[in-house]
Structures are given as C-alpha cells and as structure tokens.
C-alpha cells in the first residue's frame, strides 16, 4: 500500500480532538489537515474525575498541566485545522476552543471554527448528519 505523505489528515473528537490538535501543532510539517471536535485544550478545565485521576490536581502538578496544554502550541499551526464544538457542551466546555482560538489569534495562526448552537458534546439526528458532511467536505477541500 502507498501513503501520500504530503496529504495526511487526522480527525478526532473529545480526547481525539485533543490528539488531533496536538498532532497538528507538534508535527506541523507532517499533518496537512485536521478536524478537532470538542477538543480538550487545557486539562485544568476538564472534568476533575478524569484529569485528576491521571495528573493529580493542577495545584500539585502545575508542570504536568503546563506541558500538556495546547495553548503554547498554537503558534506552531501550519496546516488547515477545523475546530468544532457544541455551544452547550457540558463535557468539554466551549472555553477550551475559544481559548485556543485566542491563542491562535495572538500567534497569528489561522484555524477554522464552527459552532453548533445549543448542542451538547455529541451531535444527534440532523446535527450529526450535518457534522459528518462538514468533516468529509473539509478533507475533500483540503486534502485533494
């Protein structure tokens, strides 16, 4: 099998959104296109039951939280990154996306952003169809 290394894309939701954004900003010369849905951007804003289970508290592990934050990596973005969130997401609150967007603005990088008004962490029904069409179209537009 052949992989065109000039046209690699990555997609994920929630932790997968974190990984997508992390890959796009850690390996900006490897990944051309990414779609990050409901991405965790800074673990100090995520649910304590999950983050603190693995990382302890932000107060007791400030270095770990700082190292895993995607905010400082916003300056590294080169490819096309679509960030998507549900505006009523109680799991990965929109603050994650908005803070990353602010960091990108300050760094002069240009991600794309799409919001589903009134939607929670996972899309259902017509919104889910729209979401998957949007993701597919993004890869069609930027990986061909």
State what each model feature region is.
Residues 1-144:
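Active-site-proximal cap/loop segments of hydrolase catalytic domains
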């Amino acid at each position: 099998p052949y992989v065109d290394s000039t046209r690699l894309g990555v997609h994920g939701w929630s932790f997968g959104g974190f990984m997508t954004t992390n890959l796009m900003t850690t390996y900006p010369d490897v990944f051309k296109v990414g779609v990050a849905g409901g991405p965790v951007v800074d673990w100090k804003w995520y649910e304590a039951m999950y983050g603190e289970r693995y990382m302890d508290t932000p107060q007791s592990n400030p270095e770990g939280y700082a190292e895993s934050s995607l905010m400082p990596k916003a300056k590294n973005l080169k490819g096309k990154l679509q960030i998507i969130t549900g505006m009523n997401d109680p799991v990965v609150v929109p603050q994650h996306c908005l803070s990353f967007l602010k960091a990108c603005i300050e760094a002069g990088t240009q991600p794309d952003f799409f919001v589903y008004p009134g939607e929670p962490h996972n899309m259902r029904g017509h919104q889910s169809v729209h979401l998957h069409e949007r993701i597919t179209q993004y890869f069609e537009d930027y990986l061909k």
